[in-house]
Amino acid sequence: MVHPVQVGKRTRMSFAKVKDVAEMPNLIEIQLDSYKWFLDAGLYEVFDDINPISNFTGNLVLEFVGYTLDMDNIKYSVEECKERDTTYAAPLKVAVRLQNKETGEIKEQEVFMGDFPLMTEQGTFIINGAERVIVSQLVRSPGVYYNYNVDKTGKKLFSATVIPNRGAWLEYETDSNDVIYVRIDKTRKLPISILGRAMGFGSDQELLEYFGEEERFKATIEKDNTKTKEEALLEIYKRLRPGEPPTVDSAISLIDSLFFDAKRYDLSRVGRYKFNKKLAIGLRIANQIAAEDIVDKLTGEVLVAKGEKISRANAEEIQNRGINSVDVLVEDRVIRIIGNHFVDIHKCVDFDISDLNIRELVHYPTLREILDNYSDEETIKEEIKKNMTRLIPKHIIKDDIFATISYQIGLAYNIGYVDDIDHLGNRRLRSVGELLQNQFRIGLSRMERVVKERMTIQDQEAITPQQLINIRPVAAAIKEFFGSSQLSQFMDQTNPLSELTHKRRLSALGPGGLSRERAGFEVRDVHHSHYGRMCPIETPEGPNIGLINSLATYAKVNEYGFIETPYRVVDKAEGRVTGEIRYFTADEEDQYLVAQANEPLDENGCFIDKKVTVRDKGEVLVVPSKDVDLMDVSPRQLVSVATAMIPFLENDDASRALMGSNMQRQAVPLLKPYAPIVGTGIEYKAAVDSGVLPKAKNAGEVVYVSANEVRVKRELDGGVDTYRLLKFKRSNQGTCINQRPIVAKGDWVLKGEVLADGPSTDLGEIALGKNIRMGFITWEGYNYEDAMLISEELVREDVFTSIHIEEYECEARDTKLGPEEITRDIPNVSEDALKDIDERGIIRIGAEVRSGDILVGKVTPKGETELTAEERLLRAIFGEKAREVRDTSLRVPHGEAGIIVDVKVFTRENGDDLSPGVNELVRCYIAQKRKISVGDKMAGRHGNKGVISRVLPEEDMPFLPDGRPLQICLNPLGVPSRMNIGQVLEVHLGWAASALGWHIATPVFDGATETDIEDCLEKAGYNRNGKTVLRDGRTGEEFDNEVTVGIMYILKLAHLVDDKIHARSTGPYSLVTQQPLGGKAQFGGQRFGEMEVWALEAYGAAHTLQEILTVKSDDVVGRVKTYEAIVKGENIPEPGVPESFKVLIKELQALCLDVKVLNDNNQEVKFKELAEDDDEIEVLEVNMEGTEDSTTEEAKEEKGEAYIPAEEIDEEIDYENIDLLDFTSDLDIEDDFN
């Protein structure tokens, strides 16, 4: 039944049938927790890895003892950093100890290691004034992966890859003769027995005794041409280091450094965890038949008798007793299974060691050694602590390698299983913390080299840690990561949802990940393990589809980086769903049967139905209720936040839902936000967690409210918290950020309660669009191809009006010829053009500007020529005044206009940090109010997008029986073929809810049914079918059929026509081809491409075609002559040769082809070089807008040259006022073809 639910300050009528049993986690905790881990533990790990650094003789030792982030010395606040273009960071100080072993002297010092970027409370970083997000990366987890291919005869050939976090790979493969080969670090393959010999089993006999007498292994040994350990070592050395003289010692040290040196080979905690999970003997022998008695060597106890089936519990006990090799019977063959000798330490020690906090399995032989040598509890604990790196090795060990070989052999007998690399149990997340840690490690290892060199060179007595450490490599690595890594992205700040989604994004791209070109279909596809972890719907359309995903709503990331999702635990004995909620990783979940969240339960939590629909990996089964292990916590568990905001998602086709999710992120914040009448109930949580709303840090009473700040008197100590609100700030995408208080003086607020609305929020709920009265009706063809017909009311009443703020900056630099100056005194500018410029030369706040208006007056010294006698005299009399300057003022760009809302001035004198060579920096902010207009893109939440085709007067729109006109008409043909029926249900329910005065919550997969909607319509006094008689606004006559009318939530997207429309008459040209540049940003022309040429050819429009391909494009002389002819009113001359044709000829000549162009009389046509053309143009005394170089002013400024932009032509020609006599009509203009 429909029931009221309090969401923030608003009550919604909810249609949810499933009670929320689990709280949704904080939606940006993936960012916050990861960074916190880095500061608390990650940094410590990196320093620990690199400790100690000693010189080559070993008598100087440098150690990092501890570190602190100096939070009291943060230079600027977050807001100041954005204003001043600096990085929000705190100084990192490291305590360093230097020990001289010869003299025994120890020096300790605190060393400053650079400013370390800090994460803001919203989970972002401020880097050089720009807000950035570090996207989490999905990578293949380190571990052992088995696979198989089928050969021509249908035989399975198994292969394996051992992937460390960093270090050499091991790859196993089988050929069709059953010989198993190994590749070490991508080199040529060797029989696997060679690796076994090198690891210690020299003879054939030893190998067979250890691995068991198995056909494949025997075949491999036959193929092997080495017979001893030494031969095997030399063979491996030859493969890895061809061309070097092989010796046994060098081979041993090579293998040791490749695999058994923690600095060169790192499995990481995850790798060790995955190795132990895959190779542990327990899981592999479970459910097999024992071929011999399995005996505990220590006690002599028989754990499993010969011929018995090994149960799961037995298998686990066998493993924890340290038995590492078990013979099992498979089809009358004895197969030996070898584990990697790791055990659960808690099962091997008979006293409590929980204070050691060991959660991983440990290496049994090392543990046995400790237990055999010591008996005292405290001593054993001490020894365990000391030997931690041996008990839980970071690198691979021999036991691991033997276990991988054994697993490879066993696969042929169905012992073990092959892996699916797209399974989320085999893919993990690297979040901010880990990515930063890796970057820091790179910086430190570069620094380590420098430290070692300095230790060798400098005087060992006088040296201090400060002199040894060079922080540059560390600072550079961090700076490079934040500034230019593929995973450090400029935050999408269009609206709160886009911000939130960006922080929850998972990318498979980036360093160490996939590349778009290499990624196949499998990696991109939806996988059963994504359920509740990654959204199957929200992903970009285009080349990145499936490679960039979004975290599901309830998902969390565990300590190993695997994504977990919560389930309710079912007590199988009672057949009851308990209140316990546990988080499962993808491979843990695979062992259970999971029921849906909407499975009906009685009041005791028992299943009502005898048969229950469950998921088992990718299958959907119906099983007796007693077999169910787990149950989903919520129906929206499998989708992401943006997708969970689409009402009636279950009635939409997936590809349209994808578009709906993506387009919500592009919705522009409107002037007056309104929450959707038909929502899903997640809007409040999304807005609160996104970080755009100020929340009360402590409970208390509101004592002061203004547009700019809210003050809350704390309940605990009576102090006052002040919350400053952002007013009309520019977001990263140029939309407007403005916060409005929603509490009143005297209100009591709780901790975490929302105090003010931000952009696109209404009473703390996300409000991306507007509730619009619309109908599915065609109107005079204006609905063709998804176009939308809108009422003038939407324009007049500012329903879809948004504010956009653009920022422009102007720098005054030092040039070779003297400093630039910001001034009101600009040469050749009328007083009228300076009417809004103040005495400093900067525009006043509140001025209305159009394109071409001056924002900041700036003059640059001109290049000097030899002075004449008169000029020297003037210079002597008037001093510097007569020096030549050029106008290089900042003007409003083409096509922009608006009102100046803010001006900021930064100068050297005020102590502002400016980049080198800059003396003064002025920033102007121009705001525009953009009303909805023809050509703007609008969309609903169901992927139903369209462009506005016409704005119709209100009185002409179709109107309802009560006289209310529709606000938007949509094409009914846009619904059936697209299969997004959710929009129709939304319209019906919205129609009923608006009449009843309700706000609705209809959660995804658990929302209102068709009957519910019909009941609401009836309650509101409408037809149960939701259709209404409409009349034509022009004639007043009824339309033939009834029309579906209702309220739809419609968004205005960030694709505004004002940003896209563009026109050019003359402008910059490309340097090589001399054709106009392309694109609005370059002030380019429209490309007349291949197909357009065909069109003109088809019509036989020869002269038009010739003109387009020559004088309107790249006939350099011709275009100037044409200009001259138009000015003089003469006929347009014959076109010349296009520059691109000359370039083609030159390119052919560069290939040593002798190319000549002949005219009708077979005489060669001589081309002029571009330089000669330039002379000719100079004679014409006309310079149309210059080359592409002249548009990139900064490029020239970098070099410090005083240059002359194309706009200031030396003769200062003003095109409009050219006197016709300026063109001498007897110019000798040669034609290129004579």
Curated annotation (Swiss-Prot):
Specify the domain of life of the species encoding this protein: Bacteria
* Cystine connections: none
One GO biological-process annotation of the entry reads: DNA-templated transcription
Q: What class of enzyme is it?
A: transferase
| Catalysed reaction, written as an equation | RNA(n) + a ribonucleoside 5'-triphosphate = RNA(n+1) + diphosphate
Q: Tell me, what's a Pfam family for it?
A: RNA_pol_Rpb2_2
Q: Which GO terms describe its molecular function?
A: DNA binding; DNA-directed RNA polymerase activity; ribonucleoside binding
Q: Which CDD domains match?
A: RNA_pol_B_RPB2 (cd00653)
* UniProt keyword annotation of Transferase present: yes
Keyword annotations from UniProtKB, A to Z: DNA-directed RNA polymerase, Nucleotidyltransferase, Transcription, Transferase
Any single GO CC term annotated in Swiss-Prot or TrEMBL for this entry: DNA-directed RNA polymerase complex
Q: What is its EC number?
A: 2.7.7.6
Summary of the function given for this chain in its UniProt record = DNA-dependent RNA polymerase catalyzes the transcription of DNA into RNA using the four ribonucleoside triphosphates as substrates.
Protein family membership = Belongs to the RNA polymerase beta chain family.
Complex formation: The RNAP catalytic core consists of 2 alpha, 1 beta, 1 beta' and 1 omega subunit. When a sigma factor is associated with the core the holoenzyme is formed, which can initiate transcription.
Give the protein's recorded name: DNA-directed RNA polymerase subunit beta
What is the originating organism of this protein? Clostridium perfringens (strain 13 / Type A)
